[in-house]
């Protein structure tokens, strides 16, 4: 091996290149010139003695060795960030943390995420947060790749291995219809009855949609939605504007507030419910910000309609 020893900045440049998949954009994200970023990555390749990046006229991807180096880079950078948070916490006698927390959230849990981030903000006002709407599969992948710090997702529907978790609420479902719909005043509606309505649903890549599809199958129904979207807000808008019906979590309107001319009717036969909670990679030591997020999740009061039984 030759050249000066590897440093954190080189790993940050490498992580930025993986994220942006473009040398110039990666350099801009790191606030350096493109030649500087490219040169430091070449130095890293020389230091490790392996090619990391496949180069052509533009960024092509990572070599097999580069994929392994990138995984280690993410691990080292995450540990470096956790160390900085730990030292900051030791210096700050008030117990209030600072830093950046990235949260991945399944679309149906975005209103609940607002309650949790409010609790974090109340207890740690200097913490900056990024909240991203993601599928449950993307949340687990991004946690493993250190792209996010914590996720808010389903705990009991599809396997989550190697994760620590904290259950927050039970997701139950209702049929959302316009107030002039014949079912708007019903006390409840069966899944078989809901299947007969013109539906708008989340896209099939969303775990919420897979849950809903299974519920319909258990009621011997297989509706074909008129519209699909990856946004729960868009579902509500299409119920209000187009007169479609949709299936959403019962708690949603309780947190977001009533929507004009829209009614939520509980779904039954079968009763479907799933646990939703906070997840993070199960490792030791745990970063102070992740611990703070879990502590705030524990004290966050879910809406009465979705509290854990």
Which residue ranges define each predicted feature?
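A short LG(V/I)-centered, amphipathic sequence patch enriched
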Residues: 45-67
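Hydrophobic hinge/microswitch elements
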Residues: 109, 135-148, 154, 205-263
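N-terminal winged-helix
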Residues: 34-35, 39, 95-124, 128-141, ...
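Short beta-strand-centered segments that line the small-molecule binding cleft or hinge
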Residues: 3-5, 75, 93, 115-119, ...
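Short helix-boundary/capping micro-motifs
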Residues: 15-36, 59
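Secondary-structure junction motif
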Residues: 112, 154-155, 177, 183-184, ...
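C-terminal effector-binding regulatory domain of bacterial HTH transcription factors
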Residues: 1-5, 71, 89, 123-126, ...
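Flexible hinge/capping segments at coil-to-helix
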Residues: 162-199
């Amino acid at each position: 091996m030759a050249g000066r020893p590897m440093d954190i900045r080189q790993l940050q440049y490498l992580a930025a290149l993986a994220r942006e998949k473009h040398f110039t954009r990666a350099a801009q994200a790191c606030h350096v010139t493109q030649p500087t970023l490219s040169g430091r990555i070449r130095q890293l390749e020389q230091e490790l003695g392996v090619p990391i990046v496949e180069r052509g006229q533009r960024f092509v991807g990572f070599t097999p060795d580069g994929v392994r180096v990138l995984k280690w880079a993410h691990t080292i950078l995450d540990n470096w960030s956790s160390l900085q948070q730990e030292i900051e916490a030791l210096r700050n006698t008030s117990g209030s943390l600072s830093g950046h927390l990235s949260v991945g959230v399944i679309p149906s849990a975005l209103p609940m995420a607002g309650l949790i981030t409010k609790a974090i903000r109340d207890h740690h006002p200097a913490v900056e947060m990024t909240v991203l709407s993601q599928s449950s599969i993307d949340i687990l992948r991004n946690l493993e790749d250190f792209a996010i710090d914590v996720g808010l997702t389903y705990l009991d529907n599809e396997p989550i291995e190697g994760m620590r978790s904290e259950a927050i609420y039970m997701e139950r479902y209702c049929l959302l219809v316009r107030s002039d719909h014949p079912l708007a005043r019903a006390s409840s509606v069966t899944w078989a009855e809901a299947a007969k309505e013109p539906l708008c649903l989340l896209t099939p890549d969303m775990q919420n949609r897979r849950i809903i599809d299974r519920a319909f199958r258990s009621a011997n129904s297989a509706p074909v939605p008129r519209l699909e979207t990856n946004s729960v807000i868009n579902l509500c808008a299409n119920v209000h504007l187009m007169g479609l019906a949709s299936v959403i979590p019962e708690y949603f309107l309780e947190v977001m507030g009533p929507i004009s001319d829209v009614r939520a009717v509980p779904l039954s036969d079968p009763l479907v419910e799933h646990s939703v909670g906070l997840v993070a990679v199960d490792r030791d030591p745990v970063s102070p910000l992740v611990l703070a997020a879990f502590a705030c999740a524990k004290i966050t009061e879910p809406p009465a309609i979705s509290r854990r039984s």
